[in-house]
Swiss-Prot record:
Pfam families: IPPT (PF01715). Its cofactor is Mg(2+). This is tRNA dimethylallyltransferase. InterPro entries: Dimethylallyltransferase, IPT, P-loop_NTPase. The record marks 101, 123 as: Interaction with substrate tRNA. Residues 35-38, 159-163, 240-245 are annotated as: Interaction with substrate tRNA. Belongs to the IPP transferase family. Substrate binds at residues 12-17. The lineage of its organism: Bacteria, Pseudomonadati, Pseudomonadota, Gammaproteobacteria, Pasteurellales. It catalyses: adenosine(37) in tRNA + dimethylallyl diphosphate = N(6)-dimethylallyladenosine(37) in tRNA + diphosphate. Its EC number is 2.5.1.75. It comes from the Bacteria. Keywords: ATP-binding, Magnesium, Nucleotide-binding, Transferase, tRNA processing.
Length: 311
């Protein structure tokens, strides 16, 4: 019999952390973060990282594990998450995976086809080609090879364009083809929940209020500290995180403070929309929870889990 795991998914600002804390007070669970922004040290305000008080109530694994100069893949996450899940299960507890990075959940459930290691010669050739023709031209080339990846990648995102083309040149297969090849399935029985306000206008308001709150808490100073390091740039996954990119561009002088706030809020709302689109198209059953009814949401999880474990 496989051990049990709980997935608590949802868009940004939906109340996942609050519910996770409530569940930890009632269930023998340990929390694993499923968030591609919370992995970075020194990025606390703009990622809405759980506070010290919240972490005292519900410690989160897989947060603050990398410097912002480092990259982290879905495969890295799968390896790390499986290790943490095994540790939690060995303690007789249930892994509670909480977050909104849907690609990480997908990788965990379905496994991943191993991607080739970087080839410095191919990368150098692509960078030389980009210097002559521009990254937009390479993005056009990618669109012919792998239209699905090209649609997801911004024409100015040199790092991701380079990687997608590099994978094709090494393997002869597109990144989309390779990522659709299944790897090892998750060795757990898992129950999936998604939390969001039933009224989407509430989510939009929460996102706007939270972004303004981040500004009040010192988000600009947090990014200024990263900006001053000198070894970070806007093409790194950490700086491309929602909010950080907009603040970074503001610090570069690309637009004024008011425009930065507007763009940051818009980008966060777009992220929430993408997350909800992922969830609506999810292949396996999800129990939806209304974050405007937190007590009811908690009771639904407890009731559902109890009936699930009884079979």
């Amino acid at each position: 019999m496989k051990p049990t795991a709980i997935f608590l998914m949802g868009p940004t600002a939906s109340g996942k952390t609050d519910l996770a804390i409530q569940l930890r007070s009632s269930l023998p669970v340990e929390v694993i973060s499923v968030d591609s922004a919370l992995i970075y040290k020194g990025m606390d305000i703009g990622t809405a990282k759980p506070s010290k008080e919240e972490l005292a109530l519900a410690p989160h694994r897989l947060i603050d594990i990398l410097d912002p100069s480092e990259s982290y893949s879905a495969m890295n996450f799968r390896d790390d998450a499986l290790r943490e899940m095994a540790d939690i299960t060995a303690q007789g507890k249930i892994p509670l995976l909480v977050g909104g990075t849907m690609l990480y959940y997908k990788a965990l459930i379905e496994g991943l086809s191993p991607l080739p290691s970087a080839d410095e010669n191919i990368r150098a050739e692509l960078e030389q080609k980009a210097a002559q023709q521009g990254w937009a031209a390479l993005h056009t080339e990618l669109a012919k090879i792998d239209p699905i990846s090209a649609a997801r990648i911004n024409p100015s995102d040199s790092q991701r364009i380079n990687r997608a083309l590099e994978v094709f040149y090494i393997t002869g297969k597109s990144l989309t083809e390779l990522t659709e090849e299944k790897g090892e399935a998750l060795p757990y029985d898992f129950v999936q929940f998604a939390i969001a306000p039933q009224d989407r206008h509430v989510l939009h308001e929460r996102i706007e209020q939270r972004f303004h709150k981040m500004i009040e808490l010192g988000f600009q100073a947090e990014v200024e500290k990263l900006y001053a390091r000198g070894d970070l740039n806007i093409n790194l996954p950490s700086i491309r995180c929602v909010g950080y990119r907009q603040m970074w561009e503001y610090l570069q002088g690309d637009y004024d403070h008011e425009e930065m706030i507007f763009r940051g809020i818009c980008a966060t709302r777009q992220l929430a929309k993408r997350q909800l689109t992922w969830l609506r198209g999810w292949k396996t059953p999800i129990q939806w929870l209304d974050s405007l009814q937190p007590q009811q949401a908690k009771e639904t999880v407890l009731r559902h889990l109890d009936s699930y474990q009884k079979g």
